[in-house]
Amino acid sequence: SYKNLDSLSAEWQTEIRTQVGYPQAKEEVMSGVPVADQWIVLHTRSRKINELRTETFWLYGKSSHRMALYLNFLAPGALPEFNLVPGGVYEGELYFYQGVGALRALPQNMKWLDSTFLPSLCADIPVAMQSYRAVIQTHPFAEEVPLLVDNVRLVTSGNTHYLQDAGGVAVPVHIEETARVDILAITGGKPFSAFLLADAVSCELKTIWYQSEFYFWKDELN
């Protein structure tokens, strides 16, 4: 594709340049048109490799219904520009990177709100999987696809855990044992809503809502 770059759309040209190692400058990203909204922090992840900490934030826009991925890189002793708390809602703008099906974004003017909301959810697992396939068809480079699905419960068969919807459709799910025990204690085995990160093999269960309450589990590796 890189040899035929000039024949591709501007979005695909940017996407392929990014994939082969030509990152977009912050100034270039911030020159775009921002998406103003109320953003709920669905999940945060922290990884420390060779003294560099990478913080990952997944967000969802209340009005735009748009998913966003914010990456923050912190050197030793550095403080984050924005302290985004899981489950918190912030009013502000996100500047999205250019590219196909772009999720990565830079936040600006984020103000914490004393409120919350439940994102729009896929009605069941088949609808969620249809959403996953649509993302992969648009953006085959995607490694983690964010999904929101309603009315699922956690079930186990042998050593494998599954999310099962009301229709009996199930998908394998990866979940830490501590979180699994917590979810069963919180829900009593009843249905809940979930935020997942999906790939071609399985889904990772990251966040749940049960009776409108938000629950998350620390995702940190030092």
Predicted regions and their residues:
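Long, compositionally biased intrinsically disordered terminal regions
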Residues: S1-K3, I16-Q19, P23-R45, G61-N222
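A short catalytic or substrate-binding loop motif that flags glycine-/basic-rich loops and adjacent residues
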Residues: I49-R53, G188
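Broad gene-expression machinery/nucleic-acid interaction feature
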Residues: T54-T56, S193
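Generic recognition of flexible, low-complexity loop/linker segments
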Residues: H43-K48, T56
